[in-house]
Amino acid sequence: LHALGPAGVESMTSAAGVAHLAGFRYGALGLPLAFVALPLYVYMPAYYAEQFGASLAALGIVLLLVRIFDAVTDPLMGYAADHLLSMSGPRRMLLMGVGCGVLLLGFLGLFFPPPSMRQGVALLAWCFAMLIVTYLAYSALSITHQAWAARLQGGDLSQSRWVSWREAATLAGVVLASVLPSVAGMSVTTTVLGLALALAWLALRGAPQPLIMGSVGLTWHRLAQPWRGAAFRGLLGVFLLNGIASAIPATLLLFFVNDRLQAPGLEGMFLAAYFVCAAASLPLWLKVVARIGLGAGWMSGMLLSVASFAGAAVLGAGDVWPFLLICAASGLALGADLAFPAPLLARVIRLDGASAGLEGAYFGWWNSASKLNLALAAGLVLPLLQGLGYSPGQPSAQGLMALSLAYAVVPCILKLLAWGALWRWRRQWDKEQ
């Protein structure tokens, strides 16, 4: 640095500041998008049951239908993202603004239905319609946001930085959304969401703009293009195994805290430790990318996850502090799951010459698989637990053992399988560092 002289040091500092500002401007949209996702998944069912007396069984059917629709339409949203990213800057930002507005209106309509639609079948129909509107807008914006980074020039480290800014904002949104509805209510939450969307849209206007590659026509051949690449299929298999391993503990967390630890009401503290440590770990994982690369870095994160999480299998009633440490260590490992998969997918897109202009199609299928993870986790592990004798709120010794195995051991086994699958994938496809 001394050899550069004061002007050189100042130039480097200025360049770093510009890079951080660009990363912030790009990543900011992650906050309101995560802000929308958490209340929809966590708060909406209880809100409808408590405020409007909706049947939980009927709400469950509505949510199942909407989530199936959401997962199925993600590849089409990927096409829409490719089309949008092929537009000129002003038109692109206009449509992004429209998407933000539709998202806010859907969220507002969902939590504040008109008085004439607050009972019986009318309420369920309104809920279904608003969920469809909200999910479509959410998927279109989130897939476009992901594909945006993939169209920015740069190699593995550059892509990891864009993704880290996006995921850091996402984690901030998760933490904010986990607290605000219960503390300030849905009116304040909706107002904050509107402000966050507006500010994120303004920030995105000043972010580095994606490379325009020309518009693509909607054909099945174009939508199916990602599946023709063996590298994509292999990486998606790793992503599915790893994602199910992460989704199972998320599905069972409340049961584990309430019945195994006997610490009801402390799940917020555990989640906060998990997500805060994940956010704090992102700069560290960026250094790992620079040192050993994306594939080896993700494998390291998987091993850290297994090493930190396996201990949860032996916890019992009152083991609050050991579990808090496990959550913190697992959060550090989560940073790898956030920082590495998307840049690896961006590399696959770069190496597949036939995929120019189809980044959205790739991320559409990728998001669909991510939603499939959650569905598979719930659909497989909950019936299995019931079959093994676990009953929430009335656990037997056999049921608690089954809960511990399902919560901690099964995810670790799946993580190790994902590690093995990634090791095999890297032998053939991990060519670019």
In which residue ranges do the predicted regions lie?
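Membrane-embedded alpha-helical bundles of multi-pass transporters/translocases
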Residues: 8-433
